[in-house]
Each structure stands twice: as structure tokens, then as C-alpha cells.
């Protein structure tokens, strides 16, 4: 998700789940080719498995960007054919490409040819756009792209209106149609179909997994990140208890110290953890303290320690930033 799932967000989420596949923000192919790759593509090895999501519509440039992403160590290369924003449409990528399945297939084929065979090239799409939203349209899109060898589709269970709705409205106004995604899977058992859109709990995720192969969580994972702490046990069958919220913060401290020592700002990290105590007593005090103090010049990990003391009680001992 653009402006959300940067490297700091992903590192934090990995502290909560060892197994969930994490996605980068969408990066345009041209930015990958011509931009600051260290800033755009670098990530901590602890983030694995991590996917690079690309935006674009030029097969040759997408292929080059995909090859670069593979060289940087990403575990999956994903093509975004689901974002409906005006800015994205002006660049001729995102959801508007669902009107051109043959072009998407050409892009995916070019990417596949430049990426090692063990790295999946996947597509994220909607169930339709504008008036092109029948099940036949969705099946044609998926079948056309699958003909290139693409085997994984992450399907947002809403259509997108390319005109008249903001990106936020496109996440809320078009009705969810989970049944259509389930029927897509039933029609194509050979494909891996991952459902996305409006899923806010692991109970819902478990219900969907009776019909599809995977579940993609977006805003729920960001706004209430603690739900990721139960993902390994409930969805992957991993033994052992989830880490505590305190333990997650303790594990984040050395990372934050290194980032600050390298010239970074504490708020680059803290803005992603504001929802950690969502629904817990004194969560508001936790968020308020971080929001007020982390953006300040010179803010250090003491801000995190103070916020923890507020949320867990004033008698909570300060954390030590130990490796």
C-alpha cells in the first residue's frame, strides 16, 4: 500500500508474524529503473518473505524492473492491476489495465522471462472495472493472463470505478462480492487465488480459506497490527504462543536505534506502530505520546519507552535496547 508498507512497516510486521508474506509499496517500473534503488528497494533480511509490487504497462520496462527486483532479493514480483487512483490511471497502470487483458498478459510474459523460475510473478486485480464487471469478463482476464504462466492472482473482491470515485471511495462504495472470487477459484482449481478486500479479522480469514488459497490483509493489518501476532498459529499451524506487545516493542528498539544512528528519524518507524495497542486500556495515551513526541527533531527510543510505560502502567520498567 502506497505510503504505508515501507521497509520500516514491514520490519515491524515481521516481528509479529514470521510466516506472512509481506508486500512493498507499489513502485513504478520507471522509478525502479531510473530512481534511487537503495531508497526504493533496500530491505532488511529479516523481512523475508517479501514481495515487490510494480506498476506499469510497458512490457520491456516492467521486465527490466522485475529483473532488478529479483536481483535485490525479493521473493515475489507482483504486478498491480487493481489501483484505481487518477494519478495511476494517468500513467496507464493499475486497475485501468483490466480493460486490456492482452497487454497485461504481454507484461507478465515479459516479466516472467526476466525473473528466475523459482520467483513467482503474480498479479493483483479487481473483480472488474466500470461496466466491465461480469463474471465472464473476470474469467477472460484471468485466463488470458494465466496463459503466460502466471499462477497466482490476488483478487480484490470489489469492482473499481475509474471515474467519479476517489481511491478511498473505491475501497468502500462498490459492494464486496466474495462469492465471485470463490467461484473464480472453483472454475480454476489449477490457479492460486488469494482473496482481498474488507477482511478485518482472522475469523473471517479462516472462513475464506475454506474456499480460496490465501487471504490478503491490507488496512486491517496496518491499523490493527496485533492481529498478525496470531497469524502463524491460526493460519499456518505454527506451534508456540504469540509474542507479547511489549516483546514486539522490545525487539523493535535496536532497529530504531540503528535507524536513528544512520541519520533517520524516529517517526519513520513510529508512525507504523500507532495501532499496536488498539482496543487495549490506555491505547489512546500510547498513540498520543508517540504522535506528539516521535516527530520532534532528535527524538530517540526514550519516546518508545515512555509510551510503553504509559500504556502498561507508570510502574512499567523502561526497556533496554539490547541486541
Whereabouts are the PLM-identified features?
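Conserved radical SAM core fold
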Residues: 28-33, 56-59, 82-97, 159-164
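A cross-domain feature marking catalytic cores of carbohydrate-active enzymes
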Residues: 26, 54-56, 81, 123-127, ...
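Non-cysteine beta-strand/loop elements that form the S-adenosyl-L-methionine
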Residues: 24, 75-85, 147-160, 217-220
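Glycine- and other small-residue-rich loops at beta-strand/loop junctions that grip anionic moieties
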Residues: 2, 54, 96, 100, ...
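Glycine-rich tight-turn/loop motif centered on a GG-T
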Residues: 86-104, 135-136, 164-177, 238-239
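Glycine-rich, aromatic-flanked loop segments that form ligand/cofactor-binding clefts
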Residues: 19-35, 77, 81, 95-106, ...
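Glycine-rich, positively charged N-terminal anion/phosphate-binding segment
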Residues: 1-75
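Alpha/beta catalytic cores of nucleotide-metabolism and tRNA/nucleoside-modifying enzymes
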Residues: 2-3, 8, 106-109, 114-116, ...
Amino acid at each position: 500500500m502506497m505510503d504505508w508498507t515501507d521497509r520500516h512497516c514491514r520490519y515491524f510486521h515481521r516481528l509479529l508474524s514470521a510466516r506472512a508474506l509481506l508486500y512493498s509499496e507499489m513502485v513504478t517500473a520507471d522509478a525502479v529503473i531510473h530512481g534511487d534503488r537503495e531508497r526504493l528497494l533496500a530491505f532488511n533480511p529479516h523481512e523475508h518473505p517479501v514481495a515487490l509490487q510494480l506498476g506499469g504497462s510497458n512490457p520491456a520496462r516492467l521486465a527490466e524492473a522485475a529483473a532488478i527486483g529479483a536481483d535485490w532479493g525479493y521473493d515475489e514480483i507482483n504486478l498491480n492491476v487493481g489501483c484505481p487512483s487518477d494519478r495511476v490511471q494517468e500513467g496507464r497502470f493499475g486497475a485501468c489495465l483490466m480493460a486490456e487483458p492482452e497487454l497485461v498478459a504481454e507484461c507478465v510474459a515479459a516479466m516472467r522471462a526476466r525473473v528466475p523460475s523459482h520467483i513467482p510473478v503474480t498479479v493483483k486485480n479487481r473483480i472488474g472495472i466500470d461496466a466491465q464487471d461480469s463474471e465472464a469478463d473476470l474469467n477472460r482476464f484471468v485466463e488470458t493472463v494465466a496463459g503466460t504462466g502466471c499462477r497466482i492472482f490476488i483478487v480484490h473482491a470489489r469492482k473499481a470505478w475509474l471515474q467519479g470515485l476517489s481511491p478511498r471511495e473505491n475501497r468502500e462504495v462498490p459492494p464486496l462480492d466474495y462469492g465471485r472470487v470463490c467461484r473464480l477459484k472453483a472454475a480454476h482449481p489449477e490457479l492460486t487465488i488469494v482473496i482481498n478486500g474488507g477482511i478485518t479479522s482472522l475469523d473471517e480469514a479462516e472462513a475464506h480459506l475454506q474456499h480460496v488459497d490465501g487471504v490478503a490483509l491490507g488496512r486491517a493489518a496496518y491499523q490493527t497490527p496485533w492481529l498478525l501476532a496470531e497469524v502463524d498459529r491460526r493460519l499456518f499451524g505454527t506451534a508456540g504462543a504469540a509474542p507479547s506487545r511489549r516483546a514486539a516493542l522490545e525487539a523493535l528498539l535496536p532497529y530504531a536505534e540503528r535507524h536513528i544512528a544512520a541519520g533517520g528519524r524516529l517517526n519513520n518507524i513510529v508512525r507504523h506502530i500507532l495501532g499496536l495497542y488498539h482496543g487495549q486500556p490506555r491505547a489512546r495515551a500510547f498513540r498520543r505520546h508517540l504522535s506528539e513526541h516521535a516527530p520532534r527533531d532528535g527524538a530517540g527510543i526514550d519516546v518508545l519507552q515512555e509510551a510503553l510505560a504509559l500504556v502498561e502502567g507508570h510502574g512499567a520498567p523502561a526497556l533496554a535496547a539490547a541486541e
